[in-house]
């Protein structure tokens, strides 16, 4: 174990790493329920997608552990799965098999880019100030996702968003869930202040147990139409894997009769773009939080991390799921001390077990995992202290990066706005030479501008 993961060198131990891996899994487990729900809208079998999701997460996260020795976990990405189902299939009219082909090709392109150091060069070209801003922006993004998952922040026709009202007919479902999420935040906060190891994991489990008690007492009433399901497990294991055959290998079973090469390239590039910068943003944010970046702001062994992400995407497409990517929820495990691939290995094994214990894992409610995301968001805000607000050419792009991520609901959009604004502001103020803007930053700026014009 020591030879494989270098625990002493990273100032950690087996217990801490395992606890961190469990914590990461618990905050990511929702993807096992959400991904099948989204991709089934494209005509894919929900049970097959669930198994493919758990297997893709296992393969990707194990690759991360063994190729890079980092505590980062992978799974089919949110946002990309919605683009897959609702845009590529339902709007553009492609079959889900063709959409899987686009994901598969994207993964192959990523493997090539990773082996040729292109992705690593992009990572290293981003200035340290923007890397800190990305960490803060991701923190706000994660906290916002947590507030949404808890139903504490909901849609509003008049103000776009508003807080959850605790009166009315939805109180015993959405309202109680939101209150339990608030209690969960308090539980985690108190345990963190008391320096209880595994506070985030315990917070998730305690909130889940409170939900079970409330449901048994009739205080919490499930309402599937509102996304509030029963939190009491009705079964623990399922050994039926036959449904995987409905998606496995279907990426190569295609009908090219309505194939349009231009549209296909656009779709593939869209997957490529979002996955590339979401992954880079996540690696920057989580690694920054764990103090894994060196003094130049570079991430050691990044090639292995990027290659693991690329391999996972192509493998996931063959299994039958949308783009597999590095998850920002990995920061929850890092927050409780995860520093090596042993954390990722633990998470990977749990995803593999999830394919068997899916009935149990799928009952973990979103209001139990939401507090973890909110607290992780708080932790990631600490990177704001690394931003030099005395230098406006750094501070304004950093601010825009932080602002756009949660409001645009996109890590990649925040990075795009940050890079464009940082380059243009420094050029227009005559500080291009002083800031040593690399040619790659100019290229990225032009590409991002073209993306907003044509895509």
Question: Which positions does each model-derived feature cover?
Answer:
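Membrane-embedded alpha-helical modules
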Residues: 92-209, 345-455
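Helix-loop-helix hairpins and the membrane-proximal interhelical loops
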Residues: 1-48, 164-167, 204, 208-302, ...
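Loop-to-helix transition at the N-terminal end of transmembrane alpha-helices
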Residues: 43-62
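Residue-level signature of catalytic and energy-coupling elements of molecular machines
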Residues: 18, 38, 122, 198, ...
